């Protein structure tokens, strides 16, 4: 954890970066991207992952094929809504170790969910014995938990392009 003086320096650096790079919405050019088509993670067990994401969280499985780059490996996708896909690979025979938080790694994936589904998801997680945190940090709309391979998932009810109650594109 940074010292008090380091925290002051870090906040000053963030303020400098905001002043230099963060343009007011009216001055921002349109993004050259249309959105995230898909993100792909690595899992240890295809069926376990399907049961977690489809049966527990309610994200429909929309494709399951062999990974064209690694014979025997599966490549499969879940529909996250808004035409966004979450994909997975398994790599049987490689003996991959569980991931750790590291530079370049994924700290968590935040998935926008309807506010009225929060209690239903909590009930499903409780029934399945999945531990979760939230609401926390004063953000009632946010819940964190880990999938069977330790990938941290955040479900939040902020609409897309909102962060901590603030609309980012206006």
Can you name each region flagged by the protein language model?
Residues 23-25, 63-64, 72, 93-98:
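A short, acidic/glycine-rich surface segment
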């Amino acid at each position: 954890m940074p010292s008090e003086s380091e925290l002051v320096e870090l906040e000053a650096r963030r303020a400098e970066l905001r002043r230099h790079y963060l343009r007011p919405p009216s001055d921002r050019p349109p993004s050259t991207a249309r959105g995230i088509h898909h993100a792909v993670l690595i899992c240890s067990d295809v069926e376990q992952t399907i049961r977690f994401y489809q049966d527990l969280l309610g994200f429909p499985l929309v494709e399951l094929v062999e990974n064209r780059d690694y014979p025997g490996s599966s490549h499969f996708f879940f529909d996250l809504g808004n035409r966004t896909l979450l994909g997975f690979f398994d790599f049987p025979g490689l003996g991959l170790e569980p991931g750790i938080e590291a530079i370049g790694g994924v700290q968590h994936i935040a998935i926008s969910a309807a506010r009225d589904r929060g209690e239903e998801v909590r009930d499903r997680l409780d029934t399945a014995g999945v531990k979760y945190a939230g609401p926390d940090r004063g953000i009632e709309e946010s819940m964190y938990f880990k999938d069977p391979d330790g990938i941290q998932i955040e479900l939040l009810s902020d609409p897309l392009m909102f962060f901590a109650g603030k609309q980012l594109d206006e």
